[in-house]
């Protein structure tokens, strides 16, 4: 059979009315319509590569922040408590995570110890003494503050004399030095303003600026190399400033809490006479402003939220948010709904502010939504019914209480004492919350510590 030959040439369309055999001019393929799309040339510039990497990292960072924010929002309702047994120690006032499994704590009975949250093992750390330890006569005050420097290489806390500042090296907790010639009363609060400079706030109404110089660190290393007995230096303050006392009760001008804004190099301070003070804190301390707090009773805790540029101040029943750039009448406050027991500790994590109360409660305030987190309705059989809109509240466990003479004489008819949350801190992952404290009445002897995870 003969093979039919098909022409590859395209015939021109017949004009209207033309015969079927009419032939128009022949046209080839329109190559302009059928050219293959060319890929853009690969850019091999280092600048182009770095720019792409920057954009990618920005996207990853943004995603990570969203993820952390979501976790912070959901975590509180999932936390479960595991208590630690601290023996006969009295009231844990301060705590900080050293690493993923160790927390260092300070107590009213002037004990510094490390708890391993995995094994529950307690290790006591020797406290540092003044040049003249015989001068220490004060009892019942203890260690109120523990702070790590930004690089987490030094730890600052109180000494054997509660008026003195003690510095330890991390991670070994070897002693470095003691600042023992500044304050005339107990140190209530400490804030690092750089890797080598710390500020202490005292009950005598003064703020001390201390510097751990390279010379002090070098001599400390040399002493440890030649002696197995802990040997440490004694340093003097670089500056000592009194908080303003005008128009206030001078007997109540006690520096109770400090918080540092690293971006602006500003140090916030709260005094027990109901004032917030702001200082420029670099190589010295310079006062910027003082403002009366809207709720001025029992102002004992302070935290700074760098992302929100606000200070959170705890009082008897409220948390107040201060932005130093705004007028004082713009201060926003929220009520804890636990009147009388006081806000004892406060902290920022992402957009959630954790509040510890004197009644042993942990509350969680969402600064974006401007409301406390609420309970989730539980459908579990046998669970306690909860009202919709009720604040989410975690309550500390029983802890330990000494049934001593004070308890027998004044409190024996009371079945249960809640443990005030004097201190709490999140680990670096934000998934573990260490909480500690003890009974609120000053005469009672007891303790509480727990890990919420």
UniProtKB/Swiss-Prot annotation:
Q: Which UniProt keywords apply?
A: Cytoplasm, Cytoskeleton, Nucleus, Phosphoprotein, Repeat, Ubl conjugation pathway, WD repeat
The subcellular localization recorded is:
Cytoplasm; Cytoplasm, Cytoskeleton, Microtubule organizing center, Centrosome; Nucleus
Q: Where are the WD repeats?
A: 81-122, 123-175, 176-242, 243-286, 287-331, 332-366
Q: Which Pfam families match?
A: Beta-prop_DCAF12
Q: Which domain of life is it from?
A: Eukaryota
Q: Which GO terms describe its cellular component?
A: centrosome; Cul4-RING E3 ubiquitin ligase complex; cytoplasm; cytosol; nucleus
Q: Which SUPFAM superfamilies match?
A: WD40 repeat-like
Q: Where is the composition biased (Basic residues)?
A: 1-12
Which residues are annotated as modified residue Phosphoserine in the UniProt record?
15
Task: Give a GO molecular function annotation for the protein.
Answer: ubiquitin-like ligase-substrate adaptor activity
Annotated consequence of substituting residue 368 to A: Reduces association with DDB1
Region (Required for nuclear location and interaction with MOV10) location: 1-38
Q: Pathway membership of this protein? A: Protein modification; protein ubiquitination
Q: Name one GO biological process term.
A: ubiquitin-dependent protein catabolic process via the C-end degron rule pathway
Q: Which InterPro entries does the record match to this protein?
A: Beta-prop_DCAF12, DCAF12, WD40/YVTN_repeat-like_dom_sf, WD40_repeat_CS, WD40_repeat_dom_sf, WD40_rpt
Where is the segment annotated Disordered? 1-34
Q: What is its main location?
A: cytoplasm
User: Found in which tissues?
Assistant: Highly expressed in lung cancer tissues and some cancer cell lines. Restricted expression in normal testis.
> How would you summarize the oligomeric state and partners of this protein?
Component of the DCX(DCAF12) E3 ubiquitin ligase complex, at least composed of CUL4 (CUL4A or CUL4B), DDB1, DCAF12 and RBX1.
Member of which family?
A: Belongs to the WD repeat DCAF12 family.
Q: What does this protein do?
A: Substrate-recognition component of a DCX (DDB1-CUL4-X-box) E3 ubiquitin-protein ligase complex of the DesCEND (destruction via C-end degrons) pathway, which recognizes a C-degron located at the extreme C terminus of target proteins, leading to their ubiquitination and degradation. The C-degron recognized by the DesCEND pathway is usually a motif of less than ten residues and can be present in full-length proteins, truncated proteins or proteolytically cleaved forms.
Cited PANTHER family = DDB1- AND CUL4-ASSOCIATED FACTOR 12, DDB1- AND CUL4-ASSOCIATED FACTOR 12-RELATED
According to UniProt, the name of this protein is: DDB1- and CUL4-associated factor 12
> Which gene produces this protein?
DCAF12
């Amino acid at each position: 059979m003969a093979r039919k030959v098909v022409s590859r040439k395209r015939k021109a369309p017949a004009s209207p009315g033309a015969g079927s055999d009419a032939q128009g001019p022949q046209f080839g393929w329109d190559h302009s319509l059928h050219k293959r799309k060319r890929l853009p040339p690969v850019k091999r510039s280092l600048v182009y590569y770095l720019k792409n990497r920057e954009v990618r990292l920005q996207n990853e960072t943004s995603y990570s922040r969203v993820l952390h924010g979501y976790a912070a929002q959901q975590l509180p309702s999932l936390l479960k408590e595991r208590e630690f047994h601290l023996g006969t120690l009295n009231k844990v006032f301060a705590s900080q995570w050293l690493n993923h499994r160790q927390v260092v704590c300070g107590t009213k009975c002037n004990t510094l110890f490390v708890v391993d949250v995995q094994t529950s093992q307690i290790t006591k750390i020797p406290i540092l003494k003044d040049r003249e330890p015989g001068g220490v006569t004060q009892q019942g005050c203890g260690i109120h503050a523990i702070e790590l420097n930004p690089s987490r290489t030094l730890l600052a806390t109180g000494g054997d004399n509660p008026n003195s500042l003690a510095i330890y090296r991390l991670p070994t907790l070897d002693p470095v030095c003691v600042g023992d010639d500044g304050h005339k009363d107990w140190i209530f609060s400490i804030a690092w303003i750089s890797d080598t400079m710390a500020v202490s706030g005292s009950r005598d109404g003064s703020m001390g600026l201390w510097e751990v110089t390279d010379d002090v660190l070098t001599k400390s290393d040399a002493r440890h190399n030649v002696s197995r007995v802990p040997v440490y230096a004694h340093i003097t303050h670089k500056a000592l400033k009194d908080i303003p006392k005008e128009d206030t009760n001078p007997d109540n001008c006690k520096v109770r809490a400090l918080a540092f804004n690293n971006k602006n190099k500003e140090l916030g301070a709260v005094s027990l006479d109901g004032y917030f003070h702001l200082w420029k804190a670099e190589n010295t301390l310079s006062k910027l402003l003082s403002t009366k707090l809207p709720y001025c009773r029992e102002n004992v805790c302070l935290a700074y939220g760098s992302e929100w540029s606000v200070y959170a101040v705890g009082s008897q029943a409220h948390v107040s948010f201060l932005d130093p750039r705004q007028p004082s009448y713009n201060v926003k406050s929220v009520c804890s709904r636990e009147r009388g027991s006081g806000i004892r500790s406060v902290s920022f994590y992402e957009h959630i502010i954790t509040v510890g109360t004197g009644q042993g409660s942990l509350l969680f305030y969402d600064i974006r939504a401007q409301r406390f987190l609420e309970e989730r309705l539980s459908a579990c059989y046998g669970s306690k019914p909860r009202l919709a809109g009720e604040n989410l509240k975690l309550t500390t466990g029983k802890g330990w209480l000494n049934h001593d003479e004070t308890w027998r004489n004044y409190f024996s008819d009371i079945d249960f004492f809640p443990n005030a949350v004097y201190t709490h801190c999140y680990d670096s992952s934000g998934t573990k919350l260490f909480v500690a404290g003890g009974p609120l009445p000053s005469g009672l002897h007891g303790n509480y510590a727990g890990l919420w995870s």
